[in-house]
C-alpha cells in the first residue's frame, strides 16, 4: 500500500533557538477575491531539525510528517541554500 501525498514547502529559517527545532517562515502570494490585488501572506512552521544543522537565514525544504509534539508537524528535508 502506498503512502498518502505529503505537503512540501520551501521557506526561510527565522529562528534556531530551540533544541532540534527551527522556525521556518513560508511566504505565499494570493489574490484578493474581490479586489484582485496580490497579497503576501507569511506562515510560520515549527520544523524538526534532528542534527541542529540549520542557521538563521538558510533557505530550506520541509515536508509534512506525523505530529512530533504539540506544534511540530514538519521535518527538514534539505538545506537548499546556506545563509551568507
Curated annotation (Swiss-Prot):
InterPro entries, per database record: NA-bd_OB-fold, Ribosomal_uS17, Ribosomal_uS17_bact/chlr, Ribosomal_uS17_CS
GO molecular function: rRNA binding; structural constituent of ribosome
Oligomeric and partner information: Part of the 30S ribosomal subunit.
Family: Belongs to the universal ribosomal protein uS17 family.
Gene name, Swiss-Prot/TrEMBL: rpsQ
Taxonomy, superkingdom: Bacteria
Organism: Thermoanaerobacter pseudethanolicus (strain ATCC 33223 / 39E)
CDD domains: Ribosomal_uS17
Pfam families linked to this entry: Ribosomal_S17
Coiled-coil regions listed: none
The entry's keywords: Ribonucleoprotein, Ribosomal protein, RNA-binding, rRNA-binding
GO CC field: cytosolic small ribosomal subunit
Name of the protein in question: Small ribosomal subunit protein uS17
GO biological process: translation
Signal peptide: none
Function: One of the primary rRNA binding proteins, it binds specifically to the 5'-end of 16S ribosomal RNA.
Amino acid at each position: 500500500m502506498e503512502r498518502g501525498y505529503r505537503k512540501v514547502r520551501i521557506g526561510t529559517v527565522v529562528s534556531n533557538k530551540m533544541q532540534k527545532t527551527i522556525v521556518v517562515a513560508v511566504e505565499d502570494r494570493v489574490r484578493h477575491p474581490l479586489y484582485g490585488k496580490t497579497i503576501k501572506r507569511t506562515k510560520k512552521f515549527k520544523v524538526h531539525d534532528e542534527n541542529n544543522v540549520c542557521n538563521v537565514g538558510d533557505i530550506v525544504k520541509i515536508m509534512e510528517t506525523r505530529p512530533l509534539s504539540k506544534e511540530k508537524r514538519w521535518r527538514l528535508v534539505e538545506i537548499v541554500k546556506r545563509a551568507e
